[in-house]
Amino acid sequence: MKILVATGIYPPAVGGPSYYAKELVEALEALGHEAKPVTFGPLLRYPTGIRHLLFFLQLLRYMFWAERVIALDTVSVAVPVAFATAIFRTPFVVRTGGDFVWEQYLERTGELFPLKDFYTKTRIFSRKEKLLLHATSFVLRRASLIIFSTQMQKDIWVAAYHIDTMKARIIGNAVEAELPSVEPTKKNFLWYVRNTAFKNSARLHEAFNLAKQRYPEIILEEGQVPQKELFLRIQSCYAVILPSLTDISPNYIVDALRFRKPFIMDMYSGMAEQFKPYGTLVDPESIEDIVRAIEDLASEEGYAKALKKVRTFSEVRTYKEIAKEFASLLETV
């Protein structure tokens, strides 16, 4: 098959979505398919609307060639893809990432609650949020298939957007092979994320400061670094912490698992049940619960137990497996 992979960002841009797109393209090619990436990233310097039109025109150059299209988001990339594929009658599938409407709502209102509670009550949306809701609904109706990374998000979106369950599929994220770790020389907890509302910064910092009163030696490292640098830091760190309001499929925790490093993650994540046996789950709305988890890892006894748990992790899931699952689904549309 000739498969066009439309993505928001692509290397050399850094970030999980960039890495996912690159690995998917390469894995599809390794299976014998022709795969080409087309990226929205360079157009971000243009105003909203203009950049979407430019991306649509960019897509048209590839549509004479493409037999199938994979859109790796539900709005910025997927809306132009939906129009371009309609003109050429080319099937496309959309892979959901996060929930952009929920994220935007949290940023605007300052309200802080998990994704599971977002669609369960009537909310007053801004004009932008209403537009995002309509755009997402349009894409989900137009797509031949909708690919989720977790059952949790699938369940929420099927109910919220009235998705035909026959169109909804799950392709889990990759969990690559174990990487060698280094013994930590300090009690540093890593929180290298984009500081957006759903990452729950205020509660994390308050909890960490409270835990620091009992364990003054603990350190919170934060910011954003390229993946290569991040891996070096995880390799030698004490623990990884990610008490987000809801991280749907957190690659950050997957990276911690690959290095067999103790971790704290939110209990509402789409991967919470999968990773529960290997780490610590917290209620992201409870500062007390986050404090408890930090203090437990800061203690010698708690850390020894956490190391024992995380070292039992043995799951491996390759991008080749993911590419095979995509290809099998693309054959059906």
What kind of feature is each model-predicted range?
Residues V93-L131:
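Acceptor-binding helix/loop patch of EC 2.4 sugar-transfer enzymes
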Residues L57-L60, F64, I87, K116-I146:
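Membrane-proximal helix-turn-helix segments that form the acceptor-binding/catalytic region
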Residues G16, E301-E331:
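A charged, aromatic-enriched C-terminal amphipathic alpha-helix characteristic of glycosyltransferases
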Residues R141-R142, F148-S149, K154-A174:
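Helix-loop-beta element that forms the nucleotide-linked donor phosphate-binding surface
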Residues L4, I147, A174, S181-K199, ...:
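Conserved donor-binding/catalytic core segment of Leloir-type glycosyltransferases
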Residues L245:
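Aromatic "clamp/platform" in nucleotide-sugar-dependent glycosyltransferases that forms part
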Residues T280-I287, D296-E301:
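Conserved acidic donor-binding segment of nucleotide-sugar-dependent glycosyltransferases
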Residues P262-M265:
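Short hydrophobic beta-strand element within catalytic cores of glycosyltransferases
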